[in-house]
Amino acid sequence: MIITASHNPPSDNGYKVYWSHGGQIIPPVDEAIIQEVKKISRIEEIPYKELSEAKKTGLLQYIGEESDQYYIGLVAPMALGSKDANKKLGVIYSPFHGTGGRLVPKLLELRNFERLKTVSEQMVPNGDFPTLPSPNPEDSKAFGLAMEKANDDDDMILTNDPDADRLGVMVRGKNRDWQWLNGNLIGVLLLDQMLSSLQKTGGLPPNGVLVTTIVTSPLMSKVARFYGLELIQTLTGFKWIRDAALRAEQSGKQFIFGMEESHGYLCGNHTGDKDGVWAAMAFAELGASLKAEEKTPFDQLDLIYQRHGNHLDSLFTISHPGEEGKQKIFRMIEDLRQNPPSTFGGLRCLKRVDILNNIETDLLTRSEKPGPGLPSSNVLILEMGKGNRIIARPSGTEPKIKFYFNLNGDEMSVLEDKLKRIKQELQEFQQQSG
């Protein structure tokens, strides 16, 4: 069990439950635990031990420096960069008042990042996150203090959320201005670097597997297939990625990489959950290698787009607080499920994939067939051909509905215009949904 607010505000503090395989629990284990919780009617019914007794019986064990060294010993050999290149990259790091401050600086120093700077105010563990409205690397506003620390010689800002399983990145743009990278861009850069390196050394396995979620950019699958990897898609949440990776390996395949667009990444099996510490090292080395070639991450993205076409991925959230808002969100996704618009942003809706009911519908002929067979979840996918799509997913914990947009195939300016139109039309649709 890990007690954490993760990337959320302090008021959202809770805990994550992990199983023996190192990943978070999924059905039926989570349901069985809840049933046990429901049996308790009074707090006095919960058995407890004194701290001293728990220590004596071995139920309480403290993790020391040896665990840090064990982890670093596993992860450091996974580095793909050059120590000579690393020492020339200016990196600023913040753990957002969390656990990453214990390991990331050690790992980067071991890899010869001599120009590493840390945000001292955020290196101190503090569950109130006093310098941040929300310690979320998915939010560019959280990088404010790190940006204040930067000078002209700094090339990159790396951040972790407080439990250090997510990675946030800012890099210099072509005019040396700071540019925030979304989770899809970070992931595709890491994946392309890793697979390119394996290909050069002859290390690409013939049975390699990439695991992503259904809301992750289709560009990830194009990169994976270019290098000969099989793609497996899961529901959102890294617990599903871990489950799929284990199943793949049990069938004789080799799990290479897993990612979700919400800034979670994992290479191999050194852990059973997304790993922001390894990802910080990996992205820093990617940046150093590119700088040694007088390139930036944006130059590398341009090369990836030349190979696979331009891609624009975006998340759009509509919030409706309270019970009335909850009902409004329900009506909106039901309207999309039953009567989707014929077009969005000038793109014709061709197919509807209903994960909740496991039905795939051709919107031109109205013919139906079984869906992808994922666990039932209130997710709706509208496909508009050539990899363009909208995915709607109500939040399970907040009064929000999230829309994931994946557009590709045109000039970036055209894609940006389509995205703007789609967002506007969605706003109009949700107003009509009452």
Give names to the regions the model predicted.
Residues 75, 79, 84-108, 112-114, ...:
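Long hydrophobic segments that form regular secondary structure
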Residues 154-156, 177-179, 197-393, 400-404, ...:
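Phosphate-binding and adjacent anionic-ligand microenvironments
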Residues 11-17, 38, 45, 52, ...:
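Short acidic, glycine/serine/threonine-rich loops at helix termini
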Residues 4, 393-395:
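Short beta-strand micro-motifs enriched in acidic
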Residues 8-9, 95-101, 164-166, 216-218, ...:
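Gly/Ser/Thr-rich loops at beta-strand to alpha-helix junctions
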Residues 1-41, 135-159, 164, 169, ...:
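Phosphate/diphosphate-binding loops
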Residues 24-25, 173-199:
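Cysteine protease catalytic core and zymogen-processing segment of caspase-like enzymes
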